[in-house]
UniProtKB/Swiss-Prot annotation:
Its main location: cytoplasm. It comes from the Eukaryota. PROSITE patterns: ACONITASE_1, ACONITASE_2. Pathway: Carbohydrate metabolism; glyoxylate and dicarboxylate metabolism. PANTHER family: ACONITASE/IRON-RESPONSIVE ELEMENT FAMILY MEMBER. It comes from Solanum tuberosum (Potato). Belongs to the aconitase/IPM isomerase family. Its EC number is 4.2.1.3. This is Aconitate hydratase, cytoplasmic. One of its GO terms (cellular component) is mitochondrion. CDD domains: AcnA_IRP_Swivel (cd01580). Transmembrane segments: none annotated. Binds 1 [4Fe-4S] cluster per subunit. Catalyzes the isomerization of citrate to isocitrate via cis-aconitate.
């Protein structure tokens, strides 16, 4: 919950952006209490005085309205975190995680450190002798070049930033100033603009600024999840070849929420989150290897250097265009017909049967196997005996590593499944769009192209070693080989396993692959709960221990000594894990509540709920 004197100066659009980032700062939700700013937004979006008055009266009557003109009752929280808004400065996040914040003024020095650092969340290990490499190529007959840090994707995208008038119109003002000075984005930078709603399009047009965004290549591509989730589409073949053949660490700059490895695009190893105005600025610069305070962005039509300060709009300029361009009637006209649908929606054939009719030919919706063979009696706790290690991970394996939501790689098991059913590559769509098909999502589990699995001894990609045979296989194929032989599997991991988006498929997928337990140094809170919900046992190494300190390679077989009776299992109890090499160690079983034990006893939360419903 956010509180304090700075609240009154924070717009509702800014609050929405911060609240939407809750998973990134480890919260289930971010709550801003209703105050006068909320009421002003209701008026701005076309709500009647009667509705606004009722909202205020109701919340005041329930002591849920914050009035900064009245004496504030001191609130008591379990813990406190103070932020002085005067300390806030322009920044980006990247290149591989949203919580790796980089102040704008430090971007160039940070980039050079990244090239030097060993491979990791803040390193690419590019040898000194090739850090200045220039990859020259022909872009549709035009001479072009890429270097480490060259921006090849610049996208104004996300579900909240793109509904924030100040940053959207701010980006348009940057484009306007750049166009007037004679600056233009290089044609090989893939630019796009996905407004947060139809209202955004209306006020960009009303302001007269959309034409400047168009001039810089930021044309409106549609509404919905685009580059942020990996739906940027292919890069031009010449650009893709230049990156691949010269091993260029190319960059994407986007106004999205998340930049986990492999999410934005397979060919952009460096992915930075930035505000929409900064996205335009970096697109114009064409590189993240730049100090905006000292280095020119480009050369204007008068032959003089143009700097960041020359194209950056003032707060007053932005406020003026917001005031004149964002009007209540825009919200009314856009949303008054929202429940009427459009012609295509209204012409859809809708079955009238009480039960859903599964289409066996559909590659989007498939009947999941969760309830097949289910009986009314709970199966009880499942033990883990002589399980093989499917994957051996280090720290910070995110839900994007576990269950990517972006594009389906042409050589992946999911692609193979689709092609076998006559789906053309251009129609693969994304994992996110096909989350209603368990066959595809199971094949997409651990399909992240940046996956680092210690069983592969340094090789990066969505593969593993099938321990009994020594074969190197896709994770899905190896998992199916274990399942067909009746062999259970476990996963070894480091700290922060399951961080990132709270994605249910990151727990469903491993369950479908036959994973029975995950042994990690620590878990992201929501993901640990999701694992329990799918019947997977989360175990934590004891403090100071992990797979490496215990000498575990992942080549062993693991037996987890769980009691067979659920009444003998307690939240947080110690359990012994034994290996076939003679090693044994103690872990903490991370069932944290009694209800989680009930889920485990039933085989998962889905089975638990079904049994509860049928008993009513």
């Amino acid at each position: 919950e956010f509180y304090g004197g700075g609240m009154s100066g924070l717009s509702l659009a800014d609050r929405a952006t911060i609240a939407n980032m809750a998973p990134e700062y480890g919260a289930t939700m971010g709550f801003f209490p209703v105050d006068h700013v909320t009421l002003e937004y209701l008026k701005l979006t076309g709500r009647s005085d009667e509705i606004v008055g009722m909202v205020e009266a109701y919340l005041r009557a329930n002591n849920m309205f914050v009035d900064y003109n009245e004496p504030q009752q001191e609130k008591v929280y379990s813990s406190y975190l103070n932020l002085d808004l005067a300390d806030v400065e322009p920044c980006l996040s990247g290149p591989k995680r949203p919580h790796d914040r980089v102040p704008l003024k430090e971007m160039k020095s940070d980039w050079h450190a990244l090239l030097d650092n060993k491979v990791g969340f803040k390193g690419f290990a590019v040898p000194k002798e090739v850090q200045d490499k220039v990859a020259k190529f022909s872009f549709h007959g035009q001479p072009a070049e890429l270097k480490h840090g060259s921006v090849v994707i610049a996208a104004i995208t996300s579900c909240t930033n793109t509904s924030n008038p100040s940053v959207m119109l701010g980006a348009a003002l940057v484009a306007k100033k750049a166009s007037e000075l004679g600056l233009h984005v290089k044609p090989w930078v893939k630019t796009s603009l996905a407004p947060g709603s139809g209202v955004v399009t209306k006020y960009l047009l009303k302001s007269g600024l959309q034409k400047y965004l168009n001039q810089q290549g930021f044309n409106i591509v549609g509404y919905g999840c685009t580059t942020c989730i990996g739906n940027s589409g292919d890069l031009d073949e010449s650009v893709a070849s230049a990156i691949s053949e010269n091993d260029i660490v190319a960059a994407a700059v986007l106004s999205g929420n998340r930049n986990f490895e492999g999410r934005v695009h397979a060919l952009t190893r460096a992915n930075y989150l930035a505000s929409p105005p900064l996205v335009v600025a970096y697109a114009l610069a064409g590189t993240v290897d730049i100090d905006f305070e000292k280095d020119p962005i480009g050369v204007g039509k008068d032959g003089k250097d143009v700097y960041f300060r020359d194209i950056w709009p003032s707060t007053e300029e932005i406020a003026e265009v917001v005031q004149s361009s964002v009007l209540p009637d825009m919200f009314k006209s856009t949303y008054e017909a929202i429940t009427k649908g459009n012609t295509m929606w209204n012409e859809l054939s809708v079955p009238t049967t009480k039960l859903y009719q599964w289409d066996p030919k559909s590659t989007y919706i498939h009947e999941p196997p969760y309830f097949k063979g289910m009986t009314m009696d709970p199966p009880g706790p499942h033990g883990v005996k002589d399980a093989y290690c499917l994957l051996n991970f280090g720290d910070s394996i995110t839900t994007d590593h576990i269950s990517p939501a972006g594009s389906i790689h042409k050589d992946s098991p999911a692609a193979r499944y689709l092609m076998e059913r006559g789906v053309d590559r251009r129609d693969f769509n994304s994992y996110g769009s096909r989350r209603g098909n368990d066959e595809i999502m199971a094949r997409g589990t651990f399909a992240n192209i940046r996956l680092v699995n210690k069983l592969l001894n340094g090789e990066v990609g969505p593969k593993t070693v099938h321990v009994p045979s020594g074969e190197k296989l896709s994770v899905f194929d190896a998992a199916m080989k274990y399942k067909s032989a009746g062999q259970s599997t476990i996963i070894l991991a480091g700290a922060e396993y399951g961080s990132g988006s709270s994605r249910d498929w990151a727990a469903k997928g491993p369950m479908l692959l036959g994973v029975k337990a995950v042994i990690a140094k620590s878990f992201e809170r929501i993901h640990r709960s999701n694992l329990v919900g799918m019947g997977i046992v989360p175990l934590c190494f004891k403090a100071g221990e992990d797979a490496d300190t215990l000498g575990l390679t992942g080549q062993e077989r693991y037996t987890i000594d769980l009691p067979e009776n659920i009444s003998e299992i307690r939240p947080g109890q110690d359990v012994t894990v034994q290996t076939d090499t003679g090693k044994s160690f103690t872990c903490i079983v991370r069932f944290d509540t009694e209800v989680e034990l009930a889920y485990f006893n039933h085989g998962g939360i889905l089975q638990y709920v079904i049994r509860q419903l049928t008993q009513r």
